[in-house]
Curated annotation (Swiss-Prot):
Keywords: Host endoplasmic reticulum, Host membrane, Late protein, Lipoprotein, Membrane, Myristate, Viral envelope protein, Virion
Residue stretches making up the PLD phosphodiesterase domain: 309-336
Any one annotated GO CC term: viral envelope
Protein purpose: Envelope protein associated with the inner side of the enveloped virion (EV) membrane.
Gene3D superfamilies noted in UniProt: Endonuclease Chain A (3.30.870.10)
Protein name: Envelope protein F13 homolog
UniProt subcellular location: Virion membrane; Host endoplasmic reticulum membrane
Lineage of origin: Viruses, Varidnaviria, Bamfordvirae, Nucleocytoviricota, Pokkesviricetes
GO molecular function: catalytic activity
Topology within the bilayer: Lipid-anchor
Lipidation (N-myristoyl glycine): G2
Amino acid sequence: MGNIFKPIPKADYQIVETVPQSLTAINSTNLSTYECFKRLIDLAKKEIYIATFCCNLSTNPEGTDILNRLIDVSSKVSVYILVDESSPHKDYEKIKSSHISYIKVDIGVLNNESVGNLLGNFWVVDKLHFYIGSASLMGNALTTIKNMGIYSENNSLAMDLYFRSLDYKIISKKKCLFFTRMATKYHFFKNHNGIFFSDSPEHMVGRKRTFDLDCVIHYIDAAKSTIDLAIVSLLPTKRTKDSIVYWPIIKDALIRAVLERGVKLRVLLGFWKKTDVISKASIKSLNELGVDHIDISTKVFRFPVNSKVDDINNSKMMIIDGRYAHVMTANLDGSHFNHHAFVSFNCMDQQFTKKIAEVFERDWISPYAKEIDMSQI
């Protein structure tokens, strides 16, 4: 009789980055986002699912090339692009004459306030290969916006992202939401060799999936020595159409870790000209707390002065004790966790966590990471 408890086949993971040419001091040997997307298209034999906020690839040669490749391959395999209901139709004129299924998803139908956006970014090819990360389906995500994600081939974990894609398709119909499966094979209590996905908002978690906020708080509360955090915003607020509510859950957990357990906290803020004023105030208050024996360091990642208004370090990650890594696509913001749809990558494999930590460390010591100047943020 065969062994019914077969070990899960181990899969390989690669870090994927967009490192803009303007960041000349950063030397990355990781797979580029542009090459990753081309590779996924080339691998496709049956179907491609892409979930992203918007499709705006035709802004530069690299983005146009990816769009043309998707259009070409759509005559041979099924291609689904799932975008947020509110996203602009930038590439739709080219897409509508192709075989691509272009689907608008209204996450707001899931709650009484009709609030919510599709913020996650992932690709699933043939239920075997995937990308998940901060790079959206925009031309500048391949060139001038600094992004980070994860790529894997021949990985059964891809099926879990496929399940998310099907859920978004059902939501797009705005009917029969009861049939949204919210399925997953792997989660916090049953991971795939140390890897699993977590989800937001909470009403898309179901019985088996893991709520992303629960993961974030669990990792912070478990921290014994270090927390390294690369973010675009840290907002202790939850916003609706008509109000703003104080939401200190994550910030309080960080402060407790530092004050009560002596954890060293480093925060790298992806700063740009559109940074939220409340996020600025939140980061400033953390920086002010780093006195005496309280080990808090905060830096802002700034592009060179001649950069464009939308140039930003959009890489989002959290590394705990060098043992756990959480790669995010959304911000640490109550509104994101409560209303918006996204999927995060969780890693308990120490070898791959080390590789993610090396990206944070490289960025932290780079000349673009500046100590916070209170007069400039």
